Amino acid sequence: MTNNDKEKQPLLSSINNEDDNGATINIVEPVPWYSNIPQKIKNSMSKETITILIYVVLYVTSGVINSVLLKKVMNKFTNYAFFLSQLTNFGYVPIFGAVTAYKIFFTKDIPQETRDFPTRKFAIMGALDAITGFFVVIGGVSTSGPLQQLLNQAIIPFTMIASFIFLKERYSLIQLGGALVIIGGVVTSLIPSLLGGSSGGNKPFWNFFYLLSVIPGALSNVYKDIGFQAVADMDVWYLQYWDSLYQSIFGLFLFPVNNWLPPPATVKFEQILPFMKEGAECLAGINSIIPSYINGTSSFTATSCTYAPDATITCDDCHNAWIVIILYMTINIIYNIFILLVLKHAGATVYSIANTLRLPLTNIVFSIHFIMGSAVSPFSGLSVAGLVIILVGLGGYRVGSMIKQKKAAAAGGAIKVIPSYGPAGMDNIIPVQKEYIEPKSQAHLRNQFFGKLGINVPEARYRAANNNNYGDA
């Protein structure tokens, strides 16, 4: 074989998958870069990560369903908003009471120290939540679902103001800027209602009435920080039982306000018993306010009700009302359970991101006709602008909060969450990461006093004295 043949042989043999000695050569095909992405994702998905993703997806899904069902319940009880407010308050009392009784008598989940916690603090929290729920339900009847979601975000700047006044809380420029943008988004979202061109049955008076709910809601958030400061771990079912009980009691005393409210919330003092009776009939699916016709013709009388969303007197639509209210209360409990699960397993940062994502998804669902029916709220230019502005503000506020939380964590802080279902329709405020200072027990203070007198007390006794309980909060 000539030299030229030898030089050509490797090339020819490689084409035939053979080397110089006749052995077979395996040619490795190049692998596309994107083919390994699914495997990389699978390898990075630990059991804990999958669990967190499931909790987040279920939280967002249940949150969207919860908001939609709340508006559907309001539409069913348009003429009986106060009855609905009390129904949602008293309806949770036996549920939370049964779970609390079981945990007290058959488990050790609720220790004596928790049961000794002053109930007056629950009463104050319940009173504030009752006022919030009153504004939410009464005003929500004539406030469209998308606008409700946007107005709810105003609780963030109002909570910041209340925290600054009562807790001397300080906020970063990023948080303040985000709050101002949120306010701008709320104002933008109210413009269509003020100009009279809004859809979904929005009425300016009731829109502002609904917006007022963020004031007692913000005060409730701040009081939870003050009243439960010394509580290391409050059982959520025990807290909700007392909160719903006092919320129901104080809610009854708000009835006189309806005497001076315009329709459809007007209920005179002498009409309270017939009103509650008709509300109960509506719950059972019986319509009391129905169209009246002129001498059997198809023409309505001047005082007849209509089914138009912007009507002064709206006809009852109580069909299957009891089914809708049961679904709402069930989903509401499930939704709040997932809030706690996301906070526990994923943390406040993931919860904040999921909560922000839930806002546009909910408003999209409100615009789908086959879900909302006649209560559908199509997007308008200003409603989209308000949504985008609020999302930008929420993003800025969340980023500022995350930075603040990281600084608090570096300084030894910890996320302290006061779980609360709160009134219907009002979102929980995002937990703030702050340093938790455990209060000193009486025995610890006594040993400390002896130490100042020159009496030597071993360090172990300090620790033992302070680990007994959280003291009389």
UniProtKB/Swiss-Prot annotation:
- Per the record, the gene is crtp1
Query: From which organism does this entry originate?
Result: Dictyostelium discoideum
- Position of the signal peptide: none
Tell me which residues are glycosylated: 295
Task: Please give the coiled-coil regions recorded for this protein.
Answer: none
Q: What does this protein do?
A: Nutrient transporter. Involved in maintaining the osmotic homeostasis of the digestive vacuole.
Q: Which segments cross the bilayer? A: 50-70, 81-101, 122-142, 147-167, 176-196, 208-228, 249-269, 323-343, 353-373, 375-395
Pfam families the record matches: CRT-like
- Which of UniProt's keywords are assigned here? Amino-acid transport, Glycoprotein, Membrane, Transmembrane, Transmembrane helix, Transport, Vacuole
Q: Where in the cell is it found?
A: Vacuole membrane
Q: Which residues lie on this side of the membrane: Vacuolar?
A: 71-80, 143-146, 197-207, 270-322, 374
This chain belongs to the protein called Crt homolog 1
